[in-house]
Amino acid sequence: MMVEAKVPLKLTLFGEHAVVYDRPAIAMTISESLKVKVSENDKFLIISPSLNIKGVKLDLNEMKIESDEAKKVLRYVFEVLNYFEMKKPVKIEINSTVEPSVGLGTSAAVIVGTVAAYSKYLGIDLSRDEIAKISHNIELKVQGIASRMDTYTETYGGLIYFPAGGKGFEKIDTNFELTAGYIRRSMSTADVLWRVRTLKESNKEVFENILDVIGEITNRAKSLIVEQNFEELGLLMYVNHGLLFSLGITSPEADEIVSRAKQLGIKGCKISGGGAGGSIICIKSVEAEVLLRSYNARIVNSTLTKDGVIFSIL
C-alpha cells in the first residue's frame, strides 16, 4: 500500500509574526506544493531528494543524520511518527517544488503531509481539523514558538483570515492575484521568531503597540480584499512592511526591493512569512515580476488555490 499527500504551500499577506501574539493574520495557499509519499518498508526510512540542495537520506533505526539542514526538516517527520507511536515501519519520500526555508511554509507542509499520509496508511481517518491541530502542536513542540496559521492554511486551503485571539478562521472567496518570488534568507523562521521574542521582552510596550497597528492593518486588509479595492490594499502592504522593518524582521535586500517597487509605482509590495529575506509579494503586475527577477529572485507560481491537503492511495 502507498499513500501520497499533496500539500499546497502558502503566502502570508498580512499579520506575519503578529499572529504569534494573538493578532489577526491573512494567508493563502498557492499552486506550489510539497508531496509526502508513505509506502510499506521493513524499517523506517526517510528520503528527501528535492527538499535540500544535496538531498537527504536518514535511517531512523541507526539514527544517523549528517546534515544540519536535514536535522531541522526531519525532526518534524520524526515527531509525527512518534505521535502515532511508530506503529508500522514505512518509507517516507518528501518532494517539494521549492527549496525549504524561503517563507512559503515548507516546514508546516512537511508536518501536515506526514500527518495526513501516515495516518491514512495506518487506517486512521482524521478530519481536517484534527490534521491541523496535530500538525500545529508538533510544529510548536519542535520550534518552541509557532502560530497555527501555516498548518491550518495548508490543511484547509484557500485565502484565510485568522481573527485575533487564536481561535477560529474565515475562508474568503476571492480571485486575489499576486506576483511573488523569494531570495536567500539569512536565518530560519524559528530563529527570527526567537529574535522577535527577545525584542518583545526588552521593549514590551513599544512592541505591543506595533503589533496592535499591524492587527488594525490586517483587519482593514480583509475588508479591502472582499471589496477588491487593491489600490488601498497595496498601500497597506507598504505600511505593513515598514512595521516589520521596525521589528527587525526584514533584510537589506528585501527593503531595497520594496523601496524600488514603490518608486516604480507598483501598487503594493512587502515581505511575506518569516522574514530575513525569503518571500516577497507584490500586487500582480508585469513590472513586479521584472523587478523581482532583476534581484535574481526565484519567481513562484502564486496562483490562489482553493484546496488544502489532499491524499490519494496509489
UniProtKB/Swiss-Prot annotation:
GO CC list: cytosol
Binding annotation for ATP: G103, L104, G105, T106, S107, A108, A109
Any one GO molecular function term: ATP binding
Catalyses which reaction(s): (R)-mevalonate + ATP = (R)-5-phosphomevalonate + ADP + H(+)
Required cofactor(s): Mg(2+)
Pathway listed: Isoprenoid biosynthesis; isopentenyl diphosphate biosynthesis via mevalonate pathway; isopentenyl diphosphate from (R)-mevalonate: step 1/3
GO biological process: isopentenyl diphosphate biosynthetic process, mevalonate pathway
Cell location: Cytoplasm
Main location: cytoplasm
Domain of life: Archaea
Entry keyword Kinase: yes
One Pfam entry name: GHMP_kinases_C
EC number: 2.7.1.36
Subunit structure, as described in the record: Homodimer.
Family to which the UniProt record says this protein belongs: Belongs to the GHMP kinase family. Mevalonate kinase subfamily.
Function: Catalyzes the phosphorylation of (R)-mevalonate (MVA) to (R)-mevalonate 5-phosphate (MVAP). Functions in the mevalonate (MVA) pathway leading to isopentenyl diphosphate (IPP), a key precursor for the biosynthesis of isoprenoid compounds such as archaeal membrane lipids.
Protein's name according to its UniProt entry: Mevalonate kinase
